[in-house]
Amino acid sequence: MVKCLLLSFLIIAIFIGVPTAKGDVNFDLSTATAKTYTKFIEDFRATLPFSHKVYDIPLLYSTISDSRRFILLDLTSYAYETISVAIDVTNVYVVAYRTRDVSYFFKESPPEAYNILFKGTRKITLPYTGNYENLQTAAHKIRENIDLGLPALSSAITTLFYYNAQSAPSALLVLIQTTAEAARFKYIERHVAKYVATNFKPNLAIISLENQWSALSKQIFLAQNQGGKFRNPVDLIKPTGERFQVTNVDSDVVKGNIKLLLNSRASTADENFITTMTLLGESVVN
């Protein structure tokens, strides 16, 4: 009986490919609704460990043990193709993904990622980083011209599952925005949730939020010693294209919208506040 069971497990393993642990959070697009997408993003956020809350917003750890450094999102397309996406919990960056027995890592993925993630797979380093500027260059498109929505996410999963080198950069841009960016911002989550059956092009409000997450996180953190006021205003863009500044934590941009804060390695909130990434225009890591 035991031999039969062992043989059965061996046959299953051979059929499936390299066995992997189930993702920490799962989302199946074949049965997706606005509610299930929202639940997926909420579950994603809940899986991320945080230090404490600043103005009721979770502040991510700046460092964490290797064993807790990454979580996995299992995403399934309309055609039942599943990829596992690795997220760095310190910054909500996509660092790698696995499809069957092959895994793909962004060029700047931390060494820990290669050591910990997707053991037993053939590991391939992509020829670009997760930086938006890098991905847009590789895709020959800017984010404003790439469709988002649940149909777009399903297509992206299919592209990454079979790894089409030409289409992969665009697919990764879709993946990052509909998962990591939606986890950071309620506005982006709600926008994607409206498009269950159709796609949309991201407006300038979405793009500017994505670009300014680091700056917003820094100013919200510093506002604790400023009576809620930002030390430096943060420039954003409305959906209409009108530019405006966020100057305090009472702004609608902050309250109920920002769901995660990027941490820093600084021990005190002073002028030496050092963010874990540097915002340089479009040069923003996912």
UniProtKB/Swiss-Prot annotation:
Residues 1-23 form the signal peptide. The keyword Mitochondrion does not apply. It catalyses: Endohydrolysis of the N-glycosidic bond at one specific adenosine on the 28S rRNA. The active site is at E181. GO terms for biological process: defense response; negative regulation of translation. Its EC number is 3.2.2.22. InterPro entries: Ribosome-inact_prot_sf, Ribosome_inactivat_1/2, Ribosome_inactivat_prot, Ribosome_inactivat_prot_CS, Ribosome_inactivat_prot_sub1, Ribosome_inactivat_prot_sub2. GO terms for molecular function: rRNA N-glycosylase activity; toxin activity. It comes from the Eukaryota. Keywords: Hydrolase, Plant defense, Protein synthesis inhibitor, Signal, Toxin. It holds the Pfam family RIP. Belongs to the ribosome-inactivating protein family. Type 1 RIP subfamily. This is Ribosome-inactivating protein momordin II. It comes from Momordica balsamina (Bitter gourd).
